[in-house]
Amino acid sequence: MSQEKQVFSIDLAGRQLTVETGQLAKQANGAVLVRYGDTAVLSTATASKEAKNVDFFPLTVNYEERLYAVGKIPGGFIKREGRPSEKAILASRLIDRPIRPLFADGFRNEVQVVSIVMSVDQDCSSEMAAMLGSSLALSISDIPFEGPIAGATVGRINGEFVINPTVEQQEQSDIHLVVAGTKDAINMVEAGADQVPEETMLEAIMFGHDEIKRLIAFQEEIVQAVGKEKSEVKLYEVDADLNQSVREMAEKDMHSAIQVHEKHAREDAINEVKKRVIEHYEAQEADADTLGQVNEILYKIVKEEVRRLITVEKIRPDGRKGDEIRPLASEVGILSRTHGSGLFTRGQTQALSICTLGALGDVQILDGLGVEESKRFMHHYNFPSFSVGETRPMRGPGRREIGHGALGERALEPVIPSEKDFPYTVRLVSEVLESNGSTSQASICGSTLAMMDAGVPLKAPVAGIAMGLVKSGEHYTILTDIQGMEDHLGDMDFKVAGTAHGVTALQMDIKIDGLSREILEEALQQAKVGRMHILDHMLSVIAEPRTELSAYAPKIITMTINPDKIRDVIGPSGKQINKIIEETGVKIDIEQDGTVFISSINQEMNDKAKKIIEDIVREVQVGEIYEGKVKRVEKFGAFVELFSGKDGLVHISELALERVGKVEDVVKIGDVITVKVIEIDKQGRVNLSRKVLLKEEQEKEAAKEENKQEQQ
């Protein structure tokens, strides 16, 4: 293998993708620099030389954003990147999920894959470059990785599928799909869609897989040219004699324990069998390694029996049929002071979602590598330890919580009304109160209920369901509404959310090779049936969004002003707008096109603020009549306030019909008089007349008197 710099290129969606090896990060087991358009990502893979003494595969995938990639300096006092952004965490998960299944069972060496985003071209996805780079870094290294994998983004514009759409194309697309896999099979899907039919989503997945095959062939050429020989690694294996001994002791009782229907009772029964076996070996003074192997064998017994029952005997751990959904229960409006709340329970999974409405100024500001600067719709997901009856420290959200929150956000966003139709920021928080599988989908259902309770005029209600698959040889069973054990021990986790009209979000992780199109199609159709059942239940609780918002939600008035007048409303250094806010207690948000949003929980204060702004931007027209207060008196006339912020002069000669010797003889400060605008000079000064109106009144009276005399 050569250590010289080598460059490989391929066309990807009309833009050149280049891979450079042999120059950067040469002490890593594998490293590549991927350039896609002007996007550049350095991906590295490193592994420990010895296996770790753990009972899982210690893989870490990091997608690291650097703000220099878009020519920005980080905000704040420290001026360096801090904790990863939500987008970076989601990208790390996106890369981790298709890579993780491609390491051999029993491989316990620590592996770290790091992708550093060094330059960003918004039309060339840094996530897709990082996914390809991560796969290549592992593939050309000596780490025993059974790849390569590749990923592709698929959009749909006017019915035509597009690979890796540009920013402009993404705005027109009704599908936002990321698909990843090997040359033989898909193993990861992440999608958002605008109520798209299941058949179309399946076509999009297959379209993306065709592009994946081409990218994998490209990677295989690079591996052939620069790849290292894979190192021999000792895989973790249990002792054969110990395996037989434990199985003889535990299998029969474990099979009975697995078929206990209730979750906690089943866990207790399984743990009782485990405890008895462990105590037997502890009595024989078995060392820690032996006890670790015993635990591994017991886990395999549970896994094998659960899978056998599902695939061969068609029996699920809780006794349900394959397409049966657990009992459903829902409530809305259970928290009095919140703007909207929804409680959704499915079996032993329960989510309480709360909807909060805010002004447009409450949007989340995004300071990242993307073009999006803010978002007005947010969904946050919390998974406290008590939801599974455990104790652990209460810390901030982890990767899983951020991922589940983002999935819910993606599922619900297509049905959120536009800013024009509903000028509010919407924040949803889903608190998982009980967990036995499918909590992310329960949070979607709970959030729909909460928004309908809050009076958000959704385009359509959304429900979500998690599907599973257990495949053994030719036998397979698709499961609707999987619970925790089925998710953990099964071959597929397939989450589908949508409305009655189509899919809005889809997330799939597959742990096995060779999943056929037919199985995927069957799973999607079975998910649709389940989704419709859940939607019917939800609509029986609240049929449509409430017509009135909560008394505690902000009321928003929308008005439009001339964009040239925005600076008058804001005033020097914000003096004018801050004065209005201080006087009325409202929030004011002004768009560049002159749209003004005024919000507070007090409608009277909203109206007051609107009146003040109307007065500030109001244009005085010649011929208009005003009732104004005298603000100042000079020798030459009186200054009259027509409305807030606008004065005019009544010259002494225009105060009365008769000649006026002294202004104070007619008006004094504080008097309210009626005046007419007779001129606006070139300097914008407003000249007023009281005399004109008095003369008009005099003429009317004279005409009336004349008519009266004629009638006599």
Swiss-Prot record:
Catalyzed reactions per annotation: RNA(n+1) + phosphate = RNA(n) + a ribonucleoside 5'-diphosphate
Entry EC number(s): 2.7.7.8
Pfam families documented for this protein: KH_1 (PF00013), PNPase (PF03726), RNase_PH (PF01138), RNase_PH_C (PF03725), S1 (PF00575)
Cofactor(s) named in the record: Mg(2+)
Domain KH: 554-613
One cellular component (GO) term of this entry: cytosol
Binding of Mg(2+), residues: 487, 493
Domain S1 motif: 623-691
Keyword annotations: Cytoplasm, Magnesium, Metal-binding, Nucleotidyltransferase, RNA-binding, Transferase
Keyword Ligase: no
Role summary: Involved in mRNA degradation. Catalyzes the phosphorolysis of single-stranded polyribonucleotides processively in the 3'- to 5'-direction.
NCBIfam families, per the entry: polynuc_phos, PRK11824.1
Protein family membership: Belongs to the polyribonucleotide nucleotidyltransferase family.
The protein's name in its UniProt record: Polyribonucleotide nucleotidyltransferase
Name of the coding gene: pnp
